[in-house]
Amino acid sequence: MNTQQLAKLRSIVPEMRRVRHIHFVGIGGAGMGGIAEVLANEGYQISGSDLAPNPVTQQLMNLGATIYFNHRPENVRDASVVVVSSAISADNPEIVAAHEARIPVIRRAEMLAELMRFRHGIAIAGTHGKTTTTAMVSSIYAEAGLDPTFVNGGLVKAAGVHARLGHGRYLIAEADESDASFLHLQPMVAIVTNIEADHMDTYQGDFENLKQTFINFLHNLPFYGRAVMCVDDPVIRELLPRVGRQTTTYGFSEDADVRVEDYQQIGPQGHFTLLRQDKEPMRVTLNAPGRHNALNAAAAVAVATEEGIDDEAILRALESFQGTGRRFDFLGEFPLEPVNGKSGTAMLVDDYGHHPTEVDATIKAARAGWPDKNLVMLFQPHRFTRTRDLYDDFANVLTQVDTLLMLEVYPAGEAPIPGADSRSLCRTIRGRGKIDPILVPDPAQVAEMLAPVLIGNDLILVQGAGNIGKIARSLAEIKLKPQTPEEEQHD
């Protein structure tokens, strides 16, 4: 951003008083890095720490940020404020040092709230679909020439970044309920895609507590704000009478204000009609598969229509939508060496979904778009607590594929829980009598154990939120071919 553009922005968005140097602890996370990127482009001095480099930290370093790949007290020296990820413990040496030096320590969402304070904020919340819906809203507003600022939890592929500083008055942001920190946000418009039991440790295992927190989030809207909510979701339908703000509903349901009709999926695209009150029907081609993505698009269209964005811009944005990183992310179609006397190709798709509802939606999209493919899933459960709490749901959903390979649970810092491990889950699924899952004890064995189950007309779904995305990329790099020890050593 040049000096003239920055001066224009300053006339719209005042600087945070006396704040010059902002330090992020856990800066390599997508959400943290996105906020840091926006602030770097606004002209603030950015530093941060994390344990290992990744594309997020590299992008920030390219913008002039100072990144430390350790956690040491001296890293926070001279910082005006320290922003902390929810994954960072209170005894982190940088947090301790900041408190001792009386440097303010705030959560990620508090800084996001400051970015939103002087802008027209649009916040996207919900258990599933937040990242994709945020990208869709951002794409529509950009196509309409409104040049929004956006902060997303995943890579917006069209932009090549998780976040971008725009010159317009809009800030579009993913709102995270996992630690209830979205309560810091005060947007003008809020989307809620759905509400399910997840991150229940935050809510003391009480689903009513989670539901009330979503109500409180919506009541952060001004009285003239608007809540856009998916009426197909039974919990949202239950909560609607308790929302004391203007609402717009969307969904496949007949009573939705923005209704999806005549949905058809052809390969990676969805085709459907949107019916809106007092507007002409909109025939949509969406460059993203699955009924769940049609719902995400309906939410984005509801917000854009309310803002008065013309239909042509909306339709262009949805037809050219490039998606987000690790959300039904097509990594390639690769020729196979003859296996079991057969040759052919296998498609490779990487997906972040790690809740049974998300996994189910991904499987349904794959079946609808490629009904004749042999559907092979490589799944990595995420967190022992989630595996325990949703054990039966996982067992039911995972039986829908033709072949299942399962990695060990990605712990995300949790201690193992007896009976909530991958071996137990495989045993339970096997007992259902539909498929015979294969446990992959070592990620290095994935390509070797995958090859024999391919038939030459395959769609491979690499599914999960842990480090499985790296495995997906490595499979693409080696074109699904198991490597010999000599090849691995050469690499």
Swiss-Prot record:
Keyword set, alphabetical order: ATP-binding, Cell cycle, Cell division, Cell shape, Cell wall biogenesis/degradation, Cytoplasm, Ligase, Nucleotide-binding, Peptidoglycan synthesis
Q: What class of enzyme is it?
A: ligase
| Entry binding sites for ATP | G126, T127, H128, G129, K130, T131, T132
Q: What is its EC number?
A: 6.3.2.8
Q: Where in the cell is it found?
A: Cytoplasm
Q: Which reaction does it catalyse?
A: UDP-N-acetyl-alpha-D-muramate + L-alanine + ATP = UDP-N-acetyl-alpha-D-muramoyl-L-alanine + ADP + phosphate + H(+)
**Which Gene Ontology molecular function entries are recorded, alphabetically?**
ATP binding; UDP-N-acetylmuramate-L-alanine ligase activity
BP term (GO), one: regulation of cell shape
Entry annotated with the keyword Ribonucleoprotein = no
Q: Which domain of life is it from?
A: Bacteria
Q: In which pathway does it act?
A: Cell wall biogenesis; peptidoglycan biosynthesis
| Stored InterPro entries | Mur-like_cat_sf (IPR036565), Mur_ligase_C (IPR004101), Mur_ligase_C_dom_sf (IPR036615), Mur_ligase_cen (IPR013221), Mur_ligase_N (IPR000713), MurCDEF_pg_biosynth (IPR050061), UDP-N-AcMur_Ala_ligase_MurC (IPR005758)
What Gene Ontology terms describe where this protein resides (cellular component)? cytoplasm
State the function annotated in the UniProt record: Cell wall formation.
Q: Which HAMAP family match?
A: MurC
What the record says about family reads:
Belongs to the MurCDEF family.
Name of the featured protein: UDP-N-acetylmuramate--L-alanine ligase
